[in-house]
């Protein structure tokens, strides 16, 4: 997720005393630093054209899936639930990130040719998506916990509170992504492709370690603990209760946690190993460095895939989304109204009984 910025005439002073062989938040060492690195990389990147194809597929799937999610939620004004609002914001975050994927894909082949302004903008969108997406997932788990375990929506049903929570998530995400906006720019150097990267002056090493800790804590560990706590108690309640749709609810909840872990756990484990190596807790060798660099490239792709899987997890699994989409198609005369399910309702998140929602 990081790129590199520096003036070519400040190379030695800028990197004095820092290990040049390894820093990357989600990618390997920029090409123009390879000659200065103490370790000669065996293979620093996955085949770039393969990565471009993956980015293109994720872009198309995310664009289509998240657009449909937003369309169905916006059409469902009457029965829109709290979780619908969170899903709307989640789809928006993933959609904004998807719009940057063509630029990132092009940079994999040609280097960064888009200038400093786009360097800052697309990097900011990528960081904001990273933070806001996972924080919204945590909010959804809290909403499910309150609805099923405590059978209440007294707090979360207040519209002004839900809007405040969503605005707070966007604000916090922008705050956490602010260093990217401040420090990223484009660097041009002889004999290598231009790149988009951070430039933090003489304190680059210390700042980067701080920025490494932030995404691991706020972007993964804290939301994961919240999700495990909320969904753990939710599953226990569903096992004890006699709810008609509890098996469907359990499948959806398991899918939520499983996909989240599959997409983000490998990357964060590799990132943790990389952090321990930088702080000398784990001895660094060239072989270990090369393995971690390749692992960061591979596991980053899993994280990117999560943005196009969200519509499948939170919408397509639920029949209410399909009903809502069919209603939109019927309204515009694309299908017959006779094909609509009789129990089709505006909200696609799940079925409710009283104050308790039993599916995601």
From Swiss-Prot:
Location within or outside the cell = Cell membrane
> Does this entry carry the keyword Glycoprotein?
yes
Residue ranges annotated as transmembrane are 49-75, 85-105, 121-142, 164-183, 209-231, 252-273, 295-315
Disease named in the record: WHIM syndrome 2: An autosomal recessive form of WHIM syndrome, a primary immunodeficiency disorder characterized by warts, hypogammaglobulinemia, infections, and myelokathexis. Myelokathexis is a unique form of non-cyclic severe congenital neutropenia caused by accumulation of mature and degenerating neutrophils in the bone marrow. Monocytopenia and lymphopenia, especially B lymphopenia, also commonly occur.
The membrane topology of this protein is: Multi-pass membrane protein
PROSITE patterns (UniProt xref) = G_PROTEIN_RECEP_F1_1, G_PROTEIN_RECEP_F1_2
Q: Which GO terms describe its cellular component?
A: cell surface; external side of plasma membrane; mast cell granule; membrane; microtubule cytoskeleton; mitotic spindle; nucleoplasm; plasma membrane
**Main role?**
Receptor for interleukin-8 which is a powerful neutrophil chemotactic factor. Binding of IL-8 to the receptor causes activation of neutrophils. This response is mediated via a G-protein that activates a phosphatidylinositol-calcium second messenger system. Binds to IL-8 with high affinity. Also binds with high affinity to CXCL3, GRO/MGSA and NAP-2.
Q: Which gene encodes it?
A: CXCR2
Q: Which named protein is this?
A: C-X-C chemokine receptor type 2
Subunit and partners: Interacts with IL8. Interacts with GNAI2.
Q: From what organism does this protein derive?
A: Homo sapiens (Human)
User: PTM Phosphoserine: at which residues?
Assistant: 347, 351-353
- Highest lineage ranks of the organism? Eukaryota, Metazoa, Chordata, Craniata, Vertebrata
Q: Might you name a Gene Ontology BP term for this protein? A: cell surface receptor signaling pathway
Keyword Transmembrane helix attributed:
yes
